[in-house]
Amino acid sequence: MSLVVVGINHRTAPVEVRERVVFEPARIPEALQQLRSLPDVQETVIVSTCNRTELYCVAENLGQAELGEWLQRYHGLGVPLHHSLYHHDEDKAVSHAFSVASGLDSMVLGEPQILGQLKDAYRLAQEAGTTGPVLNRLFQSAFSVAKRVRTETKIGANAVSVASAAVAMARTVFASFDNRTALLVG
C-alpha cells in the first residue's frame, strides 16, 4: 500500500478552476465513500477549502491519473484537470501534509486557518470510517508538526490572512482609514 496525495491549489489553478472542484461539506461523507470504493483504495481523507482541494489516499497502484479522473467525474467536469493537479507519493506526501498543516503552503505564509480545516477534514473522514492506521498517523503527526512550527518559529508574526495582508498594504497607501470606504470583492 502507498500513501498518495493529489490536489489542486492556488499555485496550480485559477479560482475559476478551483471553485469547480470544491466539495460541499454535506456531501463529503458520500464522496469519501465513493473515493474509497475505487479499486485497491483502503483509506481516504478529502481536504476542500477555497484555496485547495486535496485527496489523501492509501492505495495500491493508484496515481494522479486515476484520482484526477475520479475528481473530474465526481464534479461532472467536461474538461480534464491533469494540467492543474499535483501529485505526491510516500515521503513527499508526508512532507506536503506537514507543509500544508503548518501554513507553509498557503497563499499567505503562516495563515492558521488551514490547520483547523485539516482537522475538520480528518474528523469527517474518521466519522465516515475512511481513515485507517496510515492516515491516522499522518494527520496526527501533521497536527503535532504544525503546533511545533507555530510555537518555535515566528511564522504567524506577520499577516496571517489575505485580508490582513490587504489592510497592511492599504496602510502604506493611506495615512488614515478615517472617512475611507472600502469595497471587498470575492
Where would I find each of the regions flagged by the language model?
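Hydrophobic Val/Ile/Leu positions in short beta-strands of Rossmann-like dinucleotide-binding domains
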Residues: 182-184
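Glycine/serine-rich phosphate-binding loop and adjoining beta1-alpha1 elements at the start
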Residues: 80-180
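A glycine-rich (often HGG/GG-containing) alpha/beta subdomain
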Residues: 1-106
